[in-house]
Amino acid sequence: NAVANGKEFTSIFISSVLNSVPFAKDREHIVCICAALCRPFTKLYACASSTAETGYRQVNGKAFHNESNAGNIAFRLEYESGVRIGDFQDKPKVQKYHTKKEFYELFSPFFRNVQISEMTGNVNAKCENVRRIPWERLEEALRFEFNLPYPDGSRMGLIDEAISAFKHRYEILG
């Protein structure tokens, strides 16, 4: 209801979500949807693990690996830079570690002002002055994100509801 009714947000935060999304196009969908929630005055803040973080440096042989953390063994994946797979003892997961340049390139299509910083193994973005998102681009993101599969194979099935809410938002906010 908040989306459809045009609720205006002063700030939006994306914390550690983007390093759990293994494919670039999927990360773009998330940023697109978050940008669609912004008004010209809204600030979007994002944080994700950077390639300077120990978890990624280990797969490049740049961080000490000893027997006590052998359960944290991970491997680099070659389909995109900064991606590794690990946590084999529980449930394997893919993690994306970002460079400052990659983070800038992820947000700059959606915002006119993008400031990127790196601190303590994280890359951070502060985004302002949202760009107008073509409806077709937003609809593509909504169709993907609101029909993701659950582990049992069923799907979210919220495409129509999401499209309706964002379409109404576009109509009332322009």
Question: What does each model-identified segment do?
Answer:
Residues 1-4, 43-174:
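Class I (Rossmann-like) S-adenosyl-L-methionine-dependent methyltransferase catalytic domain
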Residues 7-10, 42:
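Short coil/turn segments at beta-strand junctions that form active-site/ligand-binding loops
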Residues 9-26:
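A short SAM/SAH-binding and catalytic strip from SAM-dependent methyltransferases
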Residues 14-16, 38, 47-48:
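Short His-Asn-centered micro-motif
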Residues 18, 30, 50:
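Flexible, active-site-proximal loop/turn residues at the rims of small-molecule/cofactor binding pockets
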Residues 26-43:
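A short glycine-rich, Lys/Arg-flanked "PGG" loop and its adjoining helix->strand segment in the class I
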